[in-house]
Amino acid sequence: MEIKVQRLSLWMINTVFLLSPINNHQTNTINLIFEM
């Protein structure tokens, strides 16, 4: 279970980096993901 969750979070973070070219937006989105 834990491994799947870690892979999912990594995939989400990678997707965020690929989709957002603005560093500030990346940071805000990652912070939101970690707060969830």
Curated annotation (Swiss-Prot):
It comes from the Bacteria. Induction: Expressed approximately equally in exponential and stationary phases (at protein level). It holds the Pfam family YmgL. This is Protein YmgL. It comes from Escherichia coli (strain K12).
